[in-house]
Amino acid sequence: MRARVFKRGGSRPRRGKVSKALTIEEVQKIGMAMHTAWMMGVPFNRFITIHWERAGIAEVDAAQATASFLKYARDYLGSKCLPFAYIWVRENDEGDGSKGHHVHILAHLPRGQSLGRLQRGWIRAITGMSYCKKVILTRPIARHSDAARTTPQLYQFNLAILRDYCLKGASYDAAMAFSLPSWRLGGRVIGQRVGMSKNLSRAIRSGSVA
């Protein structure tokens, strides 16, 4: 039985487009978003992976499921008048069933905040099914959520590793253009492959962050 995707309003990610790799424009967008987050004082400090196929979400619905999950997080932090920023990149395996379609998220959580068990509840609400083990994996970047401030060199080193990991599904042209250390096709993805929070996209469009 196909899992339902919980509709929570807001914009609907594009569902019909099919791609097999990140484009040059998408890789550039991710890099700009990471720089913008740093300059805005909301550096990414949390790495989240959600295995949507394992959760029972159809590939065509995965972008909307990701948007719903991030809206839960945004609403939770917004209720405390706290900022939230993120980028996400979807991937798929090569049809061997090793991982299925999934999404990597780099997010900023304000100091002292944790999504903890809330995330599993959000997954249940999105899928309409019981939570399965290892659907969601999350960890702080550079071992501590405040590493960008306390150990900036270690933080930047670890962030660069995660950036390259998220970009490993870039096209050959993108990998060559940005001298990415590793490259392979990111698997077939139906719908939107890359996204970011509105506060980052607005700052990029306005040019307010140098």
Locations of regions flagged by a protein language model:
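A short acidic, Gly/Pro-enriched loop at the edge of an enzyme's catalytic core
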Residues: 102
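Long, low-complexity, serine/threonine/proline-rich intrinsically disordered regulatory regions
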Residues: 105-106
